[in-house]
C-alpha cells in the first residue's frame, strides 16, 4: 500500500508540470480536473460515462454530506466508499470544513473543533480534527484532506492570522490521529495538509513552509475562490509555489473553470476540482 507522485515533464517557459500519481486504485495522470460527486456519485451521469466520456480519473466526495447522509454505519457496512458508490478508480474526500464553515449562522468555532447544526434536521454535531480523520478513514477514499478553517476571502489580517494559527494547531492533531489509525479496507490512504492564509502573501508563504514538516504525499492550497478577485487568487498561488515540494502533487481546492485551470497549471498546480459542472 503506497502512493507516489512522479514528475515527468516541466515546461521551461512556465511552472507547468506533467506527472503521474500512483494510488492503490489506479494511476492519475496530471494535470487533471476532478469532478465533484458530493454524495460519492457525480449527479446526472453514469460512472462509466464519467470515466469514458468525461475521461475523469479521480472523483471527489464530501465528508460532511456523507456523514450526514447516508451516515458512516451504512458506508462501513458497504465496505467503504468505493463499494458503496461502485466507482472503481481513485477517490478524494474533502474534510467537510468548507461546508461546516459555510453554515455561519448554525455553527460555533472552538479550539476543540466546530459545533454545528445539520442542514437536514437541525441536529447538533461536533467536528474535531480527530473525528474528521476517523470519519475519512471510515469513508475510505485514497486521499483524505485535513480539517481546517476556511475564512472568507475578505477576512481582515488579524482574523486571517488567528484562523491560520488555529488551522495549524488542528493540522498537528489531524496528523497525530492519522498516524494512530490504520486504513479499514486494505488500501493506502494519504492525508494532505491544506495551505491557508487568505489573501496575505506572507501568511500563505508561512503556511506553505509549515506544512512541509509532515512529509505528506501531497499538498493542497485552500481558501481561494471564496470572494476575492481572480487576479488576487492567482497572486496567492504564485506566492506559495516556491515553497511547495517539487516532488509532490499540488491540489488547488474548489477552483476549476477552464480559465482558472489553465492559469493554475501555468503556476504549477496539478489537481483541480469544481462543483459547477456537476
What is the predicted function of each stretch?
Residues 165-168, 177, 181, 189-278:
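Glycine-rich phosphate/ribose-binding loops and adjacent secondary-structure elements
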Residues 1-184:
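Non-catalytic, usually N-terminal nucleic-acid engagement modules in DNA/RNA processing proteins
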Amino acid at each position: 500500500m503506497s502512493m507516489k507522485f512522479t514528475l515527468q515533464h516541466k515546461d521551461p517557459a512556465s511552472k507547468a508540470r506533467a506527472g503521474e500519481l500512483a494510488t492503490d486504485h489506479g494511476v492519475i495522470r496530471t494535470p487533471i480536473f476532478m469532478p465533484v460527486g458530493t454524495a460519492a456519485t457525480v449527479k446526472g451521469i453514469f460512472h462509466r460515462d464519467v470515466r469514458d466520456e468525461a475521461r475523469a480519473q479521480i472523483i471527489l466526495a464530501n465528508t460532511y454530506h456523507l456523514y450526514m447522509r447516508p451516515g458512516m454505519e451504512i458506508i462501513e457496512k458497504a465496505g467503504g466508499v468505493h463499494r458503496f458508490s461502485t466507482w472503481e478508480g481513485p477517490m478524494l474526500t474533502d474534510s467537510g470544513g468548507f461546508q461546516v464553515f459555510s453554515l455561519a449562522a448554525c455553527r460555533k468555532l472552538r479550539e476543540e473543533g466546530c459545533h454545528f447544526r445539520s442542514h437536514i434536521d437541525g441536529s447538533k454535531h461536533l467536528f474535531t480534527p480527530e473525528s474528521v480523520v476517523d470519519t475519512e478513514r471510515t469513508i475510505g477514499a485514497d486521499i483524505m484532506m485535513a480539517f481546517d478553517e476556511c475564512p472568507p476571502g475578505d477576512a481582515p489580517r488579524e482574523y486571517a492570522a488567528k484562523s491560520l494559527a488555529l488551522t495549524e494547531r488542528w493540522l498537528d492533531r489531524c496528523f497525530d490521529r492519522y498516524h494512530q489509525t490504520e486504513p479499514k479496507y486494505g488500501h493506502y490512504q494519504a492525508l494532505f495538509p491544506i495551505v491557508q492564509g487568505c489573501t496575505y502573501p506572507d501568511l500563505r508563504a508561512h503556511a506553505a513552509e509549515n506544512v512541509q514538516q509532515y512529509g505528506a504525499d501531497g499538498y493542497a492550497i485552500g481558501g481561494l475562490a471564496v470572494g476575492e478577485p481572480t487576479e488576487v487568487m492567482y497572486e496567492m498561488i504564485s506566492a506559495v509555489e516556491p515553497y511547495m515540494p517539487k516532488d509532490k502533487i499540488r491540489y488547488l481546492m474548489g477552483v476549476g473553470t477552464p480559465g482558472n485551470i489553465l492559469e493554475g497549471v501555468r503556476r504549477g498546480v496539478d489537481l483541480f476540482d469544481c462543483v459547477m459542472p456537476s
